Amino acid sequence: MQSTKEHRAFLIGRFQPFHLGHLEIVKRILRENDSIIIGIGSAQYSHTTVNPFTAGERHLMISRTLEREHVYNYYLVPIEDVNANSLWVSHVEALAPKFDVVYTNNPLVRRLFTEKHYEVRSLPMVNRSEWTGTKIREKMIKGENWEQNVPEPVVEVIREIDGISRIRQLSTTDEDVP
């Protein structure tokens, strides 16, 4: 008899912005699981050079991308940071639907979920030389081609919110103001 239990995965990231590497990882996870919970990490942060986009903006980037890719078996959950690592997994569990497996390469996240007896799987790194949030944000600031590294719906959201102007302004200091 075949099991009817749904296998639901959990993936956490800041998605600043959601890029092609993230999209590829989501698709790979969904080949092994029935659905995925995507935790939008550090949800309380925005308007900094490291976290320029709000949780709501990141939600739009991800949901529009997945809809365009005809992926509908996902949940998006904003997750704020807590200042006590030992409580973080319980915090995630309180916010997210139940899940069976966690996907991460982050050593701290791996440790915290392992201590709570979750199955934790590693993620393959996909085109890491180009597809990192840090490199994409740097390209935005420098006026270089960043669009090729993110899905088209992400480009659209960033343009809608004037995200390039925002991140460029955030990257300046008061000494840069005339």
From Swiss-Prot:
One of its GO terms (molecular function) is ATP binding. Pathway: Cofactor biosynthesis; NAD(+) biosynthesis; NAD(+) from nicotinamide D-ribonucleotide: step 1/1. It catalyses: beta-nicotinamide D-ribonucleotide + ATP + H(+) = diphosphate + NAD(+). Keywords: ATP-binding, Cytoplasm, NAD, Nucleotide-binding, Nucleotidyltransferase, Pyridine nucleotide biosynthesis, Transferase. CDD domains: NMNAT_Archaea. Its EC number is 2.7.7.1. GO terms for cellular component: cytoplasm. Pfam families: CTP_transf_like (PF01467). GO terms for biological process: NAD biosynthetic process. It is found in: Cytoplasm. Belongs to the archaeal NMN adenylyltransferase family. NCBIfam families: arch_NMN_Atrans, cyt_tran_rel, PRK01153.1. HAMAP family: NMN_adenylyltr. This is Nicotinamide-nucleotide adenylyltransferase. It comes from Thermoplasma volcanium (strain ATCC 51530 / DSM 4299 / JCM 9571 / NBRC 15438 / GSS1).
